Curated annotation (Swiss-Prot):
Record-given protein name: Dioxygenase easH
Organism name: Claviceps purpurea (strain 20.1) (Ergot fungus)
Database matches in SUPFAM superfamilies: Clavaminate synthase-like (SSF51197)
Record note on quaternary structure: Homodimer.
Lineage: Eukaryota, Fungi, Dikarya, Ascomycota, Pezizomycotina
Residues holding Fe cation: 141, 143, 217
Keyword Nucleotide-binding belongs to the record: no
Gene Ontology molecular functions: dioxygenase activity; metal ion binding
Domain of life where this protein originates: Eukaryota
GO biological process, one term: indole alkaloid biosynthetic process
Amino acid sequence: MTSQHQEHTGTKRFSIQSDPVEIHRAIVEDGVAIIEGFLTPEQVQKLNKDVDAPLKADREQLKFKADKKDDPHFWLADFIPDHVARVHNLVDFSHCFRHEILNHELLHKICRLTFEESGDYWLGYGAVIENGPGTTEQKWHRDQPRYPLVKEGPDAPEGMLNFFTALTDFDAETGKTQYILGSNKRVELGEPDADHPIEYVGLKPGDTTIVSGKITHRGSDNRSDKMRRAMPIMIIPSILTPFDATCHLSRELVETMTPLAQKMICRRSVMIPAPGTVEVKTGIWCVNMREAGEQIGLKSNQRAKEDAEATDAV
């Protein structure tokens, strides 16, 4: 007897040297792909050091639980679950994120392929989420929000990519992320079934799962006595508004960054398809109808003040 069920081979795994075209194809087909060793051990160490104090402060502060029964508006900070700490705006305080992650070569190769139809892309947010012992299983969800002006469904252009990067072990005890295989091809959120089984994805520190906004997934319980820590790097088309604001960043800090990293934080103009075509690109987020950075005289690749002082002291 021949089975009528779809066959799923599981989430494809790649290395940092893998062909970005193959990785992109896996994301389109499966809604998820894993890159082992996306970050080096040194980068993982630096990022963990950068977020240790902010996460500790977040855990220690009294969390305000908003009563939203009669208010349709809310802030994410009011809805962080118990046992969870979360810190955003990594560009502000993490040298590694600002200079290494935002210039990650493979990340950009994959994003250029993914968002080719909608034009340039930039950072939606850079965050670290720490799930402590006692963290409970999430509800099934998709990361891509439903905007009335944006086409939805399996055939729609990609509205976001989440480079969900492990900073600690994701295993059977700390909790592997669960994905419903094939759910990126469904319109409805759906539940797992014989044609759409659950896959539990384990990660080592430095591995990343590239998650399409169309794939249904959830976090698992943390049954261990350890923290489970991940860095979601949310990339969105530049026609959408980022979650993390960058207007508060000083010009001095921004000018230490590369032009590419500056564009990722909305300090450079971006190119999108001109009306009625995808072949011709036109600039938006402009000053005087021209490139914003050039118009305001924005410099790049400048030495940070602390780096210059350290060099002068030697």
